[in-house]
Amino acid sequence: MSIKIPFLSKQVKETELEDWDNIPSHIAIIMDGNGRWAQKRGLPRIAGHREGVSTVNRIVKTAVNANVKVLTLYTFSTENWKRPKSEVDFILKLPKEFLHVYLPGLIENNVRVQTIGDFNAVPKHTQDAIEYAMEKTKDNDGLVLNFALNYGSRYEIIHAVKQIVQKTKASELDVEQLDESYFEKHLFTNGLSDPDLLIRTGGEYRLSNFMLWQLAYTEFWFTEKLWPEFDEDTFHQALMEYQQRKRRYGGI
């Protein structure tokens, strides 16, 4: 049955999903299309990024109401530094703006904020805002809102390998003890389950260096809708299609 959350502007209806017990525990989203959304309207690209913040709030609400356990949002990639500096600076201010406005609602609704990625490379004002939100929500045990910030999967894997090599050189690890479980403990996502469902907006069909290790058995769902257009109904469509799939994990 649906769970009504006070800060939702629109409640999820029971008839919108076939099975409320078969909800993906961990959903990861590649939020693509902000710039194109703005350009289609004759607006600067940053207007699309600002509109995308409203979509984040809307989808967090929907995920809470659907009892999703983890929502990972690809917020800023290690490749995004190649964009114009003015755009990069603007994007990296958005987490602070989002949390300034919406943190009280996240706290009220038991959401816990965390981040993955090379966090130390982002501006201090961004670090401060996220660290404050993490501290304020650390005891919450509802939805984990996980911002992938300055995140790149290849960097993550190399970073893990370097840590393991150092432990091997220091005789802290016998290489024969190395297995998938041990390796995963050195990834940024340590402690999180792998995504059950990946959603990518914007009509592109690629992973863009996102969670390459973790997505091995994840169900993928793509939509032509640009991120600012992504709404509750589209989110529910992704959930309903997920419910129709049979996850075999290499079996029959």
From Swiss-Prot:
Mg(2+) binds at residues 32, 219. Substrate binds at residues 33-37, 45, 49, 77-79, 81, 83, 200, 206-208. The keyword Mitochondrion does not apply. InterPro entries: UPP_synth-like, UPP_synth-like_CS, UPP_synth-like_sf. Pfam families: Prenyltransf. It comes from the Bacteria. The lineage of its organism: Bacteria, Bacillati, Bacillota, Bacilli, Bacillales. This is Isoprenyl transferase. The keyword Transferase applies. Disulfide bonds: none annotated. Its EC number is 2.5.1.-. It comes from Oceanobacillus iheyensis (strain DSM 14371 / CIP 107618 / JCM 11309 / KCTC 3954 / HTE831). Binds 2 magnesium ions per subunit.
